[in-house]
């Protein structure tokens, strides 16, 4: 760790040019695996010491330089062993080592920002918790929304070239390119039927994908901020990237530098909002559908001409918020009119006025959730609870604890829903599935088991927010009911339960 800290304390101008030697430093892999330097960096099933294990990593890197990647052999993907060792294991180790090194330039910018020596240039970074205030405060004032699915798969060469803006070590990037080519052929990282954010994807690939998204957003948000009321004071951040792409013969210099004021006028919209979570983003505007279509075809051309990613206009849907719901962050969000009649009297004359207000609704997607529960055998396709047969061998405490944990996680996340009826249905399915699982284990009926256990089982399913609100408002039942029926956003809901799909 001291050696790693010493490297971080080197002169800032030299750090970007000497990333390649870190690949052959053992402490990098110790950091990647969260082990100390005096412990093994390999799994316990590898019966060799640290030096022997690290030598295998060096040999694997040397083999990458010796292979002829112009000739693709059908047997290359079947070469799982290197001298009797698991190639998948060592490729995963090298992948995590690459990820640690790739993060160094980003970490240095953060350290420089904290020290006040340099301003971080990533203006598009926001916390996920800012999405929920945006939905409540801004969404009801907007008219149209574009549901954008960021295209993938991405060619690995595009990911490496995008990284060149941050890591400027040619030797390191060349080795990374060879490794991705070899590892891609071995494990087929990018497939059409697998989500980029699935747990099977390594940390390195997610980091490369996020750098690609960051680069795409830096261009998109620059145009958006220039056309809004909150403009940047200068354009040097954007033109710094133009100078970078000009060196590698990218067409962005021709696209943006020739007629830059006209392009800004083309995207002029002071009410454009951009929000992204994982691989899905939304563009919302108060303006006409014409401008939304302009942004739509701009995004398609940006992906196809600049990032060489095939995309179709059909991947971007433009909907009117008053007529369609938006599926985002696991919620179904919509805007519905809330009509109220106000009677006003002035002297002897009275007037009846219709007051129409827009109300923002967040609903629990009951059908996808029931489909997710049916997929993991908590219920059938119609939503009727069934026993979880694979858990019947566990203890009663473990069975109840598993069901309660899933129920509380879902209830905790969907506490931001404006209507709780669908959430109550999901909780009912989980409760009855738990009872049926316990009854199956004890070879009893559900009715008999409930009579014997009483209400103690159902008390376990009380959600955490119900308990917290009952402590805050112990004597005001009406206040408790009003707060519980309303939306409650929690700051620890950045991770949705596994039952909710983002694919």
Curated annotation (Swiss-Prot):
One of its GO terms (cellular component) is chloroplast. Keywords: Chloroplast, mRNA processing, Plastid, RNA-binding, tRNA processing. This is Maturase K. It comes from the Eukaryota. Pfam families: Intron_maturas2, MatK_N. The keyword Plastid applies. It is found in: Plastid, Chloroplast.
